């Protein structure tokens, strides 16, 4: 027999080399063939060809514990073994010998930790059954020794495996050296080489029991086949004896069958009787159910009748109209003493109408004739009450206002300004505030005529109060008029310019202080009294009022707390997009329309006395306008906006007239010196700055811009009428403008801008005038220098002396005529500068500018001569500067 690969030491060493460094030792290594196919009926391999592999069993000691592994080795391209896969034997769950292989040399190993159980495990085919048994016995011994358990074995008898292991344990001869170096042979079993397998597959006790059993049959432990045949023969004998015993008991069986047939007949009879009883019971149950159904219907009908009677009682109670409420709604009085009863009747009527509407009333009742008739009756009551209440309130509003208008003590009189007091009027109206709330709930359309009646009546009162107050306010304000002609050419027009006219703006402020809060209060009262759904208003005496308005408040103002929230504490506050807002603004237009004429009259009166007071009035109006934020004060905002426009229009009229006064200077005869409107504008600007209040700065700055623009344009036009003296006129007037506005320009940005503009124009006029004077006295000198400069652009300085008119001789002639008696020429230049100058205070600064300009031009001339005529002597700049300084 060929030697097994399990005994191949070279193979073992190759496996140890392949797992070197893993601290594992090889127990057994053996060559196998790996395949994935199955053995068919023909005995040939299936899908894949077998691949040569080596299975190696290894163990690893870690303290007292041991771990066992099954390694699969494959051959590399160079024929060297290398690890392919490794399985832990602790996961080995099944060892199955393939029955389709007739040789019995193919088996599979099942592991319970493989990821894909759907893939068939590889099949391992050994060379012969001895190699197969040798490998499997080694695996089972290691599992039992190391793991303490055996995997499931399928396809082979484990007893046969144990018997094979006992008979085929190989003896391996090893050599060891003695002390003298001679080898000595020693015999050990394979199981003693690496792992001690003292625990066998079948225990000693089991083997002794098996020998005792076989001994009873006078057989040895190795005669298993004979023992099996003997057991089969005994089993067949026992089965034959059982059949014989059954045949002997046939009479007994017949007797039992007869008894069973009699019992079956009795059972059939009982079943028939039970069927009869069941039919009778079913009929009885049907009768009982019929009786119960009729009884239940009667009970339900009784309950329904009772509930129906209760519901009808409720409906009748709901449809009943109390006599006291019917009397109040159809013919009751609207006196103050009876208002509580009227309110209760209104509340009952509104509740009754809501109760007959579908959401609050069952839809079944809504179509009943009695309900329809009662609803029609309630609608008739509602229409009657709304008509009576509306007629009463219209007459009541008219009578209240007529009473107040007929009493002159309510209005301002000669020598006595009276603040309008509507506390009593509002108190009387508040008596009917809740009535209006209920009228709105009953019929919204009835409020339109009531609002118009209230607005019409109260408008008469407000216009009368404003007219009387404005007339007395103008009559009681004593102040002399300021001139409206500020910038005219006449000298006497500004003599009264400093008259104190503050009483005018105070009167206007007083008019606003008294009437703007009154109009806001009236708007607020009207919005809530007439049930407009708008947001709450600011309280009276808001942002637009000053201390003076607070000091004028008398005790009657305590009644201005109208108690609007007391009308209906559950009144909601809708947003600013309320649909009532448009209707409210239209009603406020009717309420307050026409009162603006009296405010316009005060503005026009103030303008006639002092146009500049428009500045103060503009600031006062702007302050009140910024304080009106509430929606119900919409008309008051419009009124203040119109007043602001009126004030701005009057002030613009004043500005336009003043501009026309400035432009009229242009048509005068030749003018010299400072024009009269220059210093007068400074006085006007000073006065305007004193009147600025609040947001009036933009208005004043616009006026400044228009004034100064016209002034500068007119000045330029006047100067162009006489070009000979134009620069003198310009520099004198621009200097006067700067001098008169120096202080204001430091604090007013708009005037500062024009101040810098005038400064630039002054410098330009000075430069032109001084250049003219210098050229007048030294014309030949600087014309000669101009010719030299012109030639220097085209030829070299050395060639210039050879040009016509620029020779050295010509230079000497020119110097002699221009610089001989230069002191006289300079004195003449000073006299000419002084001759036409009306403002003597400008002469020193102009003369300094003139000397500086002359020295600069002369220095340029000397430098040109030094370049072109280096050998010629010219008086130096230092000499000329000394001469100018001595004069």
Curated annotation (Swiss-Prot):
Keywords: Cell membrane, Coiled coil, Cytoplasm, Cytoskeleton, Exocytosis, Membrane, Secreted, Transport
Biased composition (Acidic residues): 555-569
Bilayer disposition of the protein: Peripheral membrane protein
Subcellular location: Cytoplasm, Cytosol; Cell membrane; Cytoplasm, Cytoskeleton, Phragmoplast; Secreted, Extracellular exosome
Coiled coil: 221-248, 281-301
Recorded GO CC terms: cytoskeleton; cytosol; exocyst; extracellular exosome; phragmoplast; plasma membrane
Disruption phenotype: Embryonic lethality.
UniProt family annotation: Belongs to the SEC3 family.
Protein name listed in UniProt: Exocyst complex component SEC3A
Organism whose genome encodes this protein: Arabidopsis thaliana
Gene that encodes the chain: SEC3A
């Amino acid at each position: 027999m060929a030697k097994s690969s399990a005994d191949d030491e070279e193979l073992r060493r190759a496996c140890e080399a392949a797992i070197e460094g893993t601290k594992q030792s090889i127990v057994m290594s053996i060559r196998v063939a790996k395949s994935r196919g199955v053995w068919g009926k023909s005995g040939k391999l299936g899908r894949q060809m077998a691949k040569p592999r080596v299975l190696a069993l290894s163990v690893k000691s870690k303290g007292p514990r041991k771990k066992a592994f099954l390694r699969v080795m494959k051959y590399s391209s160079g024929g060297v073994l290398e690890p392919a896969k490794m399985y832990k034997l602790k996961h080995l769950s099944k060892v199955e010998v393939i029955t389709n292989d007739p040789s019995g040399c193919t088996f599979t190993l099942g592991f319970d930790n493989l990821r894909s159980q759907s893939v068939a495990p590889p099949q391992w085919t050994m060379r012969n059954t001895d190699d197969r048994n040798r490998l499997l016995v080694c695996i089972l011994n290691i599992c039992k020794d190391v793991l303490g358990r055996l995997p499931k074995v399928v396809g082979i008898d484990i007893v046969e495996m144990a018997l094979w292991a006992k008979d085929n344990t190989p003896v391996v001869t090893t050599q060891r050296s003695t002390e003298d170096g001679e080898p000595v042979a020693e015999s050990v079993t394979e199981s003693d080489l690496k792992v001690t397998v003292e625990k066998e597959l079948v225990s000693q006790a089991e083997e002794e029991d098996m020998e005792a059993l076989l001994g009873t049959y006078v057989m040895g432990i190795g005669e298993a086949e004979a023992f099996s045949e003997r057991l089969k023969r005994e089993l067949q004998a026992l089965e034959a004896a059982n059949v014989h015993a059954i045949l002997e008991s046939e009479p007994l069986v017949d007797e039992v069958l007869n008894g069973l047939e009699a019992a079956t007949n009795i059972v059939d009879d009982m079943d028939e009787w039970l069927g009869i009883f069941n039919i009778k019971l079913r009929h009885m149950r049907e009768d009982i159910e019929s009786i119960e159904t009729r009884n239940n219907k009667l009970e339900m009908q009784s309950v329904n009748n009772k509930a129906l009677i209760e519901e009808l009682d409720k409906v009748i109670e709901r449809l009943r109209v109390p006599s006291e409420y019917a009397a109040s709604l159809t013919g009751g009085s609207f006196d103050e003493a009876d208002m509580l009863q009227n309110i209760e009747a209104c509340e009952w009527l509104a509740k009754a109408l809501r109760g007959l509407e579908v959401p609050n009333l069952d839809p079944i009742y809504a179509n009943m004739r009695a309900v329809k008739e009662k609803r029609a009756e309630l609608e008739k009551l509602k229409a009657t009450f709304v008509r009576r209440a509306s007629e009463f309130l219209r007459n009541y509003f008219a009578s209240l206002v007529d009473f107040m208008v007929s009493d002159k003590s309510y209005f301002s009189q000669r020598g006595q300004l009276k603040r309008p007091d509507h506390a009593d009027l509002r108190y009387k109206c508040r008596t009917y505030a809740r009535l209006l709330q209920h009228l709105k709930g009953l019929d919204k359309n009835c409020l339109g005529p009531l609002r118009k009646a209230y607005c019409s009546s109260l408008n008469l009162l407000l216009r009368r109060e404003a007219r009387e107050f404005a007339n007395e306010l103008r009559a009681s304000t004593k102040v002399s008029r300021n001139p409206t002609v500020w910038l005219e050419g006449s000298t006497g027009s500004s003599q009264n310019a400093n008259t104190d006219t503050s009483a005018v703006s105070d009167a206007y402020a007083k008019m606003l202080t008294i009437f703007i809060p009154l109009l806001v209060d009236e708007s607020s009262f009207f919005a809530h009294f007439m049930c407009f759904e708008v947001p709450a208003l600011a309280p009276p005496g808001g942002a637009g009022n000053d201390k003076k308005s607070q000091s004028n408040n008398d005790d009657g103002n305590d009644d201005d707390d109208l108690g609007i929230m007391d009308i209906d504490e559950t009144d909601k506050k809708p947003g600013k997009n309320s649909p009532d807002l448009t209707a409210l603004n239209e009603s406020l237009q009717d309420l307050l329309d026409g009162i603006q004429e009296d405010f316009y009259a005060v503005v026009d009166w103030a303008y006639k006395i002092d146009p500049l007071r428009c500045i103060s009035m503009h600031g006062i109006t702007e302050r009140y306008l910024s304080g009106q934020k509430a929606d119900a004060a919409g008309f008051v905002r419009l009124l203040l906006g119109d007043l602001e426009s009126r004030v701005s229009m009057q002030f613009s009229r004043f500005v336009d007239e003043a501009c026309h006064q400035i432009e009229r200077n242009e048509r005068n005869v030749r003018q010299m010196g400072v024009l009269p409107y220059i210093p007068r504008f400074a006085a006007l600007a000073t006065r305007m700055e004193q009147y600025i209040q609040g947001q009036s700065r933009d208005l004043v700055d616009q006026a400044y811009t228009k004034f100064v623009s016209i002034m500068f344009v007119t000045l330029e036009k006047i100067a162009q009428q006489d070009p000979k003296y134009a620069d003198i006129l310009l520099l004198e007037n621009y200097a006067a403008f700067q001098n008169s506005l120096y202080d204001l320009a430091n604090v007013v940005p708009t005037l500062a801008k024009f101040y810098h503009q005038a400064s630039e124009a002054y410098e330009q006029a000075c430069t032109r005038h001084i250049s003219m004077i210098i050229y007048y006295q030294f014309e030949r000198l600087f014309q000669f220098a101009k010719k030299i400069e012109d030639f220097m652009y085209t030829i070299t300085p050395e060639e210039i002396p050879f040009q016509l008119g620029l020779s050295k001789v010509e230079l000497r002639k020119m110097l002699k005529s221009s610089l001989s008696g230069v002191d006289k020429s300079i004195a003449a230049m000073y006299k000419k500068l002084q001759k036409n100058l009306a403002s003597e205070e400008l002469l020193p600064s102009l003369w300094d500018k003139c000397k500086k300009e002359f020295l600069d031009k002369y220095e340029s001339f000397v430098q040109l001569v030094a370049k072109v005529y280096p050998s010629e002597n010219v008086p130096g700049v230092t000499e000329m500067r000394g001469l100018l300084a001595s004069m």
